[in-house]
Amino acid sequence: MDVPEETRLRHKRDFIQFLDSMYMEEIKALVHQKRHRLIINISDIHHHFREVASRILKNPNEYMQSFCDAATEATRAIDPKYLKEGELVLVGFEGYFVSRVVTPRELLSDFIGSMVCVEGIVTKCSLVRPKVVKSVHFCPSTGEFTNRDYRDITSHAGLPTGSVYPTRDDKGNLLVTEYGLCKYKDHQTLSIQEVPENAAPGQLPRSVDVIAEDDLVDSCKPGDRVSVFGIYKALPGKSKGSVNGVFRTILIANNIALLNKEANAPIYTKQDLDNIKNIARRDDAFDLLARSLAPSIYGHAWIKKAVVLLMLGGVEKNLKNGTHLRGDINMMMVGDPSVAKSQLLRAIMNIAPLAISTTGRGSSGVGLTAAVTSDQETGERRLEAGAMVLADKGIVCIDEFDKMNDQDRVAIHEVMEQQTVTIAKAGIHASLNARCSVVAAANPIYGTYDRSLTPTKNIGLPDSLLSRFDLLFIVLDQMDAGIDSMISEHVLRMHRYKNDRGEAGPDGSLPYAREDNAESEMFVKYNQTLHGKKKRGQTHDKTLTIKFLKKYIHYAKHRITPKLTDEASERIAEAYADLRNAGSDTKTGGTLPITARTLETIIRLATAHAKMKLSSEVTKADAEAALKLMNFAIYHQELTEMDDREQEERQREQAEQERTPSGRRGNQRRNNEDGAENDTANVDSETADPMEVDEPSVEQFSGTVSAARIETFERVFGQHMRTHRLDDISIADIETVVNNNGVGASRYSADEIMALLEKLQDDNKVMISDGKVHII
């Protein structure tokens, strides 16, 4: 609106007095740093003249031009030559806006025409364009120059003017525009979206367009969390001959402040800090945090521990030579359906301060990284941030990772290691930060995990991608009656539980309510329905509340920066060398390739464990804890336990067969065959009736070969085939392999090896033909 001259001059005198009394040092610093915007704290205005502060917030258009004139005059009083003719010192605001600190969702029509502070994350940035402020035109006929000023809705110097260039003067003479004498200012539009962790569940995130001009352009980039101070205005719709009552709203910025990682930090009470330190001093702190992560999920203790370390993260470092050392931990879970992989992702979403969820089929490469889009109104190119850029310094959860296209999966390679997104499209070259942890869940390539194949063949992902995951867990659906009984009991307790108000649980479609920052309860209260009956002589395993767990993880993640000690460095280097040797040995076969990235993984895990203990140093104990987790992820113990149970079942079946009469007859037949093994006729009879030969041979040696030697043979033989990726091998080579690599006091005889191979053939695991063993 157009402010009367008398009112504007009165406000100018008041503001000059205010600046002389409180902001002379800031104005001198402005001149010294060659800036053209003075930032004023609204609290200082409130202390100087209380009533004016509230009027500035409610009706800023009346005061903005007076403030700029006062700041310009105060600057000229300090240095008359600092500003050129026609230049102004712009004014921006900061401070505590009380009820006017809003998110894009809360920015309603009540705030139109007033000054607000909008907090959110930048999702789109347009290119910086020049906007004309003053045009100069020359008339060749008269030799005179004509000036024209331009104002739009973003200007505070009066009513908006037309934007049409004059082509003739008042007398009808032609005018020529002198572009070199015209004045322009930088202009850029941004899109601010509400932060993902504060978005209402089940609803699309809201956004607001922001106009940044002059020195505010390029002050932020997509993915940055910002507080934008500005005036909320409504723009009339472009209607063709009809009246449109719906208006488009924009925010005209006068100050943009970047939010740091502590912006959304919870408020800690003294009791909270004492409780956090008490938990860190406990010997079972790691187990307690893992148990509290997702108490509704039974088992998976090692995976829960890995998730705790993942949320804490390591220490990010940027060396002087420009090298970036990643501190975030990436994790992947592969396994059978219905083993709570997706539920673990949901638990991360519920606890992590910043987490964005997506799925493999519903995500594209540009949707995860960044995209170059066209503005619907101007048609110009603009950069739009993807999920990983929006989750900067957070966690990205990708479910159904195996369903993602190969082209889209390649797009996240750079993010997972370099933690940046580089775009070079449509004339735009930019590099955006994407410092996030990736947690992926996938099913095996055949639907269920095939234990006879290597982990790499089951997963079906390239090594270039697998090596970027610090941890790879194989989650199996074990058919165990005891475990199944405990899982069913646990799940039934979950379904029977109701909270104190008798409700089954919160509805995801309820309006979002911000979490209070009051003192948090430490432990979950015992509930017989939820936690089960206490057994005699057994205490209830306590779990932390979700609110306190969030505070603990946030405190340990952002307040603690551990440093590696010499003894921890030596232990990590020694363990890495052992892992490399084991990776090249024929006795072992891990889920992940052992590369130099594995060494950095151990360092990150040890650092995260030190954070969990609130320690300023990474000790040898932290390195040992990281190595235990690393060994479980690489040489997954669940596979060995499952094979042991199958081996025990086979031994029981063999023992029962030995006690039957057919077993005794088989032994007698086997002895007769051994006595005539050089007879050609007997060899022909063996090939004519293979069933009579295979069965007794197994029964003969199953009674004489110990269970340990049987297990060693199958383990060494299977690992040799997986390590060298062989489909067939000669029996002579098998004898060499098992006798050179087997752990035992005596060597395997040829008959012993043949009997064991025939047993594998009966189990449909191998096929023996022409002196060769083929893997089925």
Curated annotation (Swiss-Prot):
InterPro entries according to UniProt: AAA+_ATPase, MCM, Mcm3, MCM_CS, MCM_dom, MCM_lid, MCM_N, MCM_OB
Binding site for ATP: G335, D336, P337, S338, V339, A340, K341, S342
Span list, region Disordered: 643-701
Subcellular location: Nucleus
Superkingdom classification of source: Eukaryota
MCM domain: residues covered: 285-491
Catalytic reaction list: ATP + H2O = ADP + phosphate + H(+)
Composition-biased stretches (Acidic residues): 686-697
Residue positions of motif Arginine finger: 467-470
Gene Ontology annotations for the cellular component aspect, listed alphabetically: MCM complex; THO complex
Tissue: Expressed in root meristem, shoot apex and flower buds.
GO annotation, biological process: DNA replication initiation
GO molecular function terms noted in the UniProt entry: ATP binding; ATP hydrolysis activity; DNA binding; helicase activity
One Pfam family here: MCM_lid
Coiled-coil ranges per UniProt: none
Ranges annotated as biased composition (Basic and acidic residues): 647-661
Keywords of the record: ATP-binding, Cell cycle, DNA replication, DNA-binding, Helicase, Hydrolase, Nucleotide-binding, Nucleus
Sequence similarity: Belongs to the MCM family.
Function of the molecule: Probable component of the MCM2-7 complex (MCM complex) that may function as a DNA helicase and which is essential to undergo a single round of replication initiation and elongation per cell cycle in eukaryotic cells.
UniProt name for this protein: DNA replication licensing factor MCM3
Lineage, broadest ranks: Eukaryota, Viridiplantae, Streptophyta, Embryophyta, Tracheophyta
